[in-house]
Amino acid sequence: MEGLTVGRIVHFVIREWDANRINRRRTNSESIKERMAHNEWNLGAQAHIGTSVEEGEEYPMIIVKVLDKERGVVRGQVFLDGNDVYWVEAIYSHQDEPLPGSWHWVERE
């Protein structure tokens, strides 16, 4: 696949499974405050805070490893609307009709 290199930014389409994992690990400031008041928050723990994620939403992803250049299979870090990222592996390209769990090139205007 022409142009497929480490460091390239593409779009990743969120699957329901991804959305559930991301949303489950996220918290908010009120929850943290409550847990800290009762010594239920581990000192030094990183809180994942951000907007809710849904299946079909697209987020920028930086390619961190090309597994199969010919078939467009990659691993990447998805940049979410929050203070966290999400690692995906063995993700295939689907350029014609972006499907959940696939990546595609960023559209140019």
Where are the regions that the model predicts?
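Generic alpha-helix signal with a bias toward terminal, lower-confidence helices
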Residues: 16, 22-26, 75, 90
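Intrinsically disordered, low-complexity, charged/polar segments
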Residues: 52-59, 64-109
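Glycine-aromatic-enriched surface loops/turns that form tight recognition elements
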Residues: 25-35, 42-44, 49, 93-101, ...
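Short intrinsically disordered terminal tails
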Residues: 1-4, 108-109
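Short, charged beta-turn/beta-strand-edge "cap" motif at the junction between a beta-strand
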Residues: 1-2, 9, 13-20
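Residue-level signal for functionally critical sites in structured catalytic/ligand-binding pockets
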Residues: 5-8, 27
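Short beta-strand-centered aromatic/proline hotspots
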Residues: 21-36, 51-67
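Intrinsically disordered, low-complexity boundary segments flanking structured domains
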Residues: 1, 45-51, 63
